[in-house]
A protein has these predicted regions:
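Short acidic-aromatic low-complexity motifs
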Residues: 1-39
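A solvent-exposed, acidic/Ser-Thr-rich amphipathic alpha-helical stretch
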Residues: 29-87
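A short, polar/proline- and glycine-enriched secondary-structure boundary/capping micro-motif
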Residues: 54, 99-102, 130-136
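Hydrophobic/aromatic beta-strand elements that line small-molecule binding cavities or substrate pockets
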Residues: 74-80, 94, 107-113
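Generic short beta-strand segments
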Residues: 90-96
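Short beta-strand edge/turn micro-motifs at domain boundaries
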Residues: 107-133
C-alpha cells in the first residue's frame, strides 16, 4: 500500500548518515543494513553500469571508489514521491580526487523502491530529470 509520506521519511533516514563516506563506511553500512531488505539491490547509473546485491555488494562498490577519491559523499537535496512505492532523491555527489586533490561535484538522482515498508532497490541516475523519468 502506498504511503508517500512514510516512504519519504524512511528514505530520508538513509541519507541522514553518510553511508558512502570514506572513513565512515563501516558504521554507515551497518546502519544501512538495518533499514533495507536482505536482498537489497543497487542498479548503478548507465555510465558506470552494473548491479550489486545486498549491502555487502554495495559496500564493495563504494570501497572501490576509495581508490580514486579521498572524500566521497551524497548530499540529498530533494525527496520526491514517485509512482506507487517509489521515492526519488535528488542532490549532489561531492568528492575529492585522491591523486589530484581536485574537488568534484556531480548531480545525482536515486529512485528507491519500497515494498512492505522496506527499501528493496535503488536505481542510480546522473541527474534529477533522469531519475524523475524513471520513477514514473
Amino acid at each position: 500500500m502506498d504511503d508517500p509520506d512514510g516512504n519519504i521519511e524512511l528514505i530520508r533516514r538513509i541519507y541522514g548518515f553518510d553511508w558512502a563516506a570514506v572513513g565512515k563506511r563501516a558504521d554507515g553500512f551497518d546502519r544501512l543494513r538495518d533499514l533495507v531488505s536482505d536482498d537489497f539491490q543497487s542498479q548503478m547509473s548507465a555510465e558506470l553500469g552494473g548491479r550489486t546485491i545486498g549491502v555487502d555488494g554495495l559496500a564493495l562498490f563504494v570501497e572501490a571508489l576509495e581508490q580514486d577519491f579521498s572524500e566521497f559523499h551524497y548530499e540529498a537535496e530533494e525527496f520526491i514521491p514517485g509512482d506507487g512505492d517509489k521515492v526519488v532523491v535528488a542532490g549532489r555527489i561531492r568528492c575529492v580526487g585522491r591523486a589530484s586533490k581536485v574537488p568534484l561535484s556531480q548531480e545525482f538522482g536515486h529512485v528507491w523502491t519500497i515494498a512492505d515498508g522496506t527499501p528493496t532497490h535503488v536505481e542510480a541516475h546522473m541527474s534529477r530529470a533522469e531519475a524523475l523519468s524513471a520513477a514514473r
